Amino acid sequence: MSALSLENITGVYAPSALLVVGTFILKKEWVPFAVALAAGFVAWKLSVGGSSKPRKVLNPNEFQNFVLKEKNDISHNVTIYRFALPRPTDILGLPIGQHISLAATIEGQPKEVVRSYTPISSDNEAGYFDLLVKAYPQGNISKYLTTLKVGDTMKVRGPKGAMVYTPNMCRHIGMIAGGTGITPMLQIIKAIIRNRPRNGGNDTTQVDLIFANVNPDDILLKDELEKLAAEDDGFRIYYVLNNPPEGWTGGVGFVTPDMIKERLPAPASDIKILLCGPPPMVSAMKKATESLGYTKARPVSKLEDQVFCF
């Protein structure tokens, strides 16, 4: 922001000038002290608090270290990691739909290992960001994260990714997620609901989510998803389980073309299908959507694609 911006004139220079003038009127010999105080205030405001807009800290060109603030185990192999930003008012500055890269030097690996993750927090939550990570036996970064203690640091770079969600970019979004593939979907769902007309926004996008997992306990972030669906009639969830409990009313087995046809928007120029999950599942969903008449997914998705794979 320019030092001569309207925001700084009204929020920094004007109060400082009033302090000096007011002091001159009351007691002239105090003016030098008032000038010094005003100068200090101006310098502080311009360097730290001169803008009401939060500072974006992500750098797409270089890794930065962020301190682990909290670890919250939500199952035997799934943890939410909260990393602190440099200042309480800072935000990541991550566009909706994009992700960040985590890097670490891991013993036995010839070079630094880098993996992508989507935060489950959003930029309206300042001072930190949250990552939901499932530790896989062969997952170098996910296993590395489990070794971190509060106070340790993690190297982060971003934003990256071809998806940048903007309000009303399409009429209806269909989502198919498996396991931790729910994280980019949640980011978009929360942004849409936060920007509904009832909340002062203008986003009227309809959203239908098919969320596939093996067991009931594998359904990540279920409470948050259920809360969002309960408060917003434009968002609907259909769960699919490989091993359903007795009395289960959702889908059973793998996500099928029939499930997609019944639950997600039909092919049209103003809809999108978003896919995220284990590679075998995403591959199967690409074939299924193509068989139903959706535009064939590209090997590397672009923003304009009808079927987009994270």
UniProtKB/Swiss-Prot annotation:
Membrane topology recorded in Swiss-Prot or TrEMBL: Single-pass membrane protein
GO biological processes: protein histidyl modification to diphthamide; tRNA wobble base 5-methoxycarbonylmethyl-2-thiouridinylation
Superkingdom of source: Eukaryota
Record pathway: Protein modification; peptidyl-diphthamide biosynthesis
TM ranges: 30-50
Coiled coil: none
Annotated Gene Ontology cellular component terms: mitochondrial outer membrane
UniProt-annotated location(s): Mitochondrion outer membrane
Primary enzyme class: oxidoreductase
Domain FAD-binding FR-type: 61-166
Record's keyword terms, sorted: FAD, Flavoprotein, Membrane, Mitochondrion, Mitochondrion outer membrane, NAD, Oxidoreductase, Transferase, Transmembrane, Transmembrane helix
Keyword Transmembrane helix: yes
Cofactor: FAD
Entry-linked PANTHER family: NADH-CYTOCHROME B5 REDUCTASE, NADH-CYTOCHROME B5 REDUCTASE-LIKE
Subunit composition and interactions: Monomer. Component of the 2-(3-amino-3-carboxypropyl)histidine synthase complex composed of dph1, dph2, dph3 and a NADH-dependent reductase, predominantly cbr1.
Protein's name in the database: NADH-cytochrome b5 reductase 1
Naturally occurring in which organism (per UniProt): Emericella nidulans (strain FGSC A4 / ATCC 38163 / CBS 112.46 / NRRL 194 / M139)
Lineage per the UniProt record: Eukaryota, Fungi, Dikarya, Ascomycota, Pezizomycotina
